[in-house]
Amino acid sequence: MRLILLGPPGAGKGTQAAFLTQHYGIPQISTGDMLRAAVKAGTPLGLEAKKVMDAGGLVSDDLIIGLVRDRLTQPDCANGYLFDGFPRTIPQADALKSAGIALDYVVEIEVPESDIIERMSGRRVHPASGRSYHVRFNPPKAEGVDDVTGEPLVQRDDDREETVRHRLNVYQNQTRPLVDYYSSWAQSDAAAAPKYRKISGVGSVDEIKSRLSQALQS
């Protein structure tokens, strides 16, 4: 099973990715993890990437594709792989295609923007323990305080509504075009293209898991 999960921040991709990697026995491949591992191992591509990053530059798509190819030769990828946060842009998707890197499915998890804003801006955390709550879906026993210690809960900067809206804008401008890219490729060249599936990310974790499993069997 070789696939990409697409969807806006807060759509639940992380939860579903964890289910898929366990279910299919495949690794979740993140470009960030890959870069860090290559730099640490001192591979030729890792050293090249380190040079660029140390100079404050952005690692080129060609370099990323090289790292992806290296990563996919490792034994844990024998049954497949799940790309996490990659590709992010059309040039990266084109580079992936040109490199002949195989994909079986591209799955989009669709959640209305208003739901995402409610999901993310409602999160509250207890900094010392990491316990998390949600003002609507998983509220603390007493408003605004941790169940165990009674200490105040905080809203992380990442979860503030204006930050969430900004991240959604970035997604719409940068990554959303990938949805059109893969869906139109699947329509125009079904034999060569990965199968494109769209599922709703609204509902319980188990409901979404069930939709995802069905999508990957069709």
Curated annotation (Swiss-Prot):
GO terms for molecular function: adenylate kinase activity; ATP binding. Gene3D superfamilies: P-loop containing nucleotide triphosphate hydrolases (3.40.50.300). Residues 122-159 are annotated as: LID. Its EC number is 2.7.4.3. Pathway: Purine metabolism; AMP biosynthesis via salvage pathway; AMP from ADP: step 1/1. InterPro entries: Adenyl_kin_sub, Adenylat/UMP-CMP_kin, Adenylat_kinase_CS, Adenylate_kinase_lid-dom, P-loop_NTPase. GO terms for cellular component: cytoplasm. ATP binds at G10, A11, G12, K13, G14, T15, R123, S132, Y133, G203. One of its GO terms (biological process) is AMP salvage. Its main location: cytoplasm. It catalyses: AMP + ATP = 2 ADP. Keywords: ATP-binding, Cytoplasm, Kinase, Nucleotide biosynthesis, Nucleotide-binding, Transferase. Consists of three domains, a large central CORE domain and two small peripheral domains, NMPbind and LID, which undergo movements during catalysis. The LID domain closes over the site of phosphoryl transfer upon ATP binding. Assembling and dissambling the active center during each catalytic cycle provides an effective means to prevent ATP hydrolysis. Catalyzes the reversible transfer of the terminal phosphate group between ATP and AMP. Plays an important role in cellular energy homeostasis and in adenine nucleotide metabolism. This is Adenylate kinase.
